[in-house]
Amino acid sequence: MTDQVRSDVQEKLVQSGEYEKLSQHIQARLRNSGWYDKVSALAQEEASKQDKVELSSLLEKVQPQACDLVDDDIKVETLKMIASFLEGALK
């Protein structure tokens, strides 16, 4: 997906109000799966290894692992929700 397509999809989601609904749904699913707790523990562990904690370096270390920790069913469900929205928007 190109940056322009991604930007266009996001704009349509925001304009329709679906972005907020999707965001809330994802947050709830992540919370229920324990993802926030896992990422928090990961960030704390990484921060304890650094003499001076800088957000940019912490994000650089934790973000790829945090993305990997998202359950596959949440990823699939999210993509299906976006695809469903796009099908309706393109009709």
UniProtKB/Swiss-Prot annotation:
Keyword Protein transport found: yes
Keyword annotations: Activator, Chromatin regulator, Cytoplasm, mRNA transport, Nucleus, Protein transport, Transcription, Transcription regulation, Translocation, Transport
Gene3D superfamilies membership: 1.10.246.140
InterPro entries from the UniProt entry: TF_ENY2, TF_EnY2_sf
Cellular component, GO annotation: DUBm complex; nuclear pore; nucleoplasm; P-body; SAGA complex; transcription export complex 2
GO molecular function: chromatin binding; transcription coactivator activity
One GO process term, biological-process aspect: regulation of transcription by RNA polymerase II
Compartments in which it is found: Nucleus, Nucleoplasm; Cytoplasm, P-body
Cross-referenced HAMAP family: ENY2_Sus1 (MF_03046)
Family membership: Belongs to the ENY2 family.
Binding partners and assembly: Component of the nuclear pore complex (NPC)-associated TREX-2 complex (transcription and export complex 2), composed of at least SUS1, SAC3, THP1, SEM1, and CDC31. TREX-2 contains 2 SUS1 chains. The TREX-2 complex interacts with the nucleoporin NUP1. Component of the 1.8 MDa SAGA transcription coactivator-HAT complex. SAGA is built of 5 distinct domains with specialized functions. Within the SAGA complex, SUS1, SGF11, SGF73 and UBP8 form an additional subcomplex of SAGA called the DUB module (deubiquitination module). Interacts directly with THP1, SAC3, SGF11, and with the RNA polymerase II.
Described function: Involved in mRNA export coupled transcription activation by association with both the TREX-2 and the SAGA complexes. At the promoters, SAGA is required for recruitment of the basal transcription machinery. It influences RNA polymerase II transcriptional activity through different activities such as TBP interaction and promoter selectivity, interaction with transcription activators, and chromatin modification through histone acetylation and deubiquitination.
Protein name per UniProt: Transcription and mRNA export factor SUS1
Organism: Yarrowia lipolytica (strain CLIB 122 / E 150)
UniProt lineage: Eukaryota, Fungi, Dikarya, Ascomycota, Saccharomycotina
Protein encoded by which gene: SUS1
